[in-house]
């Protein structure tokens, strides 16, 4: 199968327009998806001392179903490491993030995928220990 790459420079009202579509045309979006620890705006007092995990443009969350034993004790730190893994049995497949923290490890899923298995706690903003 032949693949072509297109660079779209012309835009109509802010949108890229490709007028001549064929049934075999495919648009592939390829972007870096690094895992990062991000902070909230400092004006959000409720998130002081907490951080979230983001992979590319996706925000991740922690669900109790994946972290039942240590859900309320999990913390992030500058030394936290991350591993991504594909899990096929949630919403036809998602990338999870596993952390290895000082005291315990945790599993995070994309925010869009939460509340699709079992009722329980969910958290985006995780205590951060510098």
Identify the residue ranges that each predicted region occupies.
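Short, small-residue-biased leader/transition segments that mark boundaries at the very start
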Residues: 3-8
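C-terminal beta-rich recognition modules with glycine/proline-rich loops and embedded aromatic residues
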Residues: 11, 19-20, 26, 30-130
């Amino acid at each position: 199968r032949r693949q072509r790459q297109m660079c779209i420079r012309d835009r109509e009202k802010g949108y890229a327009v490709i007028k001549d579509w064929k049934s075999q045309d495919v648009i592939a979006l390829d972007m870096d998806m690094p895992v990062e620890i991000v902070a909230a705006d400092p004006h959000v007092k409720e998130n002081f001392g907490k951080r979230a995990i983001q992979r590319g443009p996706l925000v991740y969350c922690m669900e109790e179903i994946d972290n039942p034993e240590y859900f309320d004790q999990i913390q992030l730190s500058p030394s936290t490491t991350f591993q991504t893994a594909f899990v096929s049995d949630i919403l036809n497949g998602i990338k999870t993030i596993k952390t290895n923290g000082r005291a315990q490890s945790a599993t995070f899923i994309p925010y869009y995928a939460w509340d699709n298995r079992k009722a329980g706690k969910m958290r985006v903003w995780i205590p951060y220990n510098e």
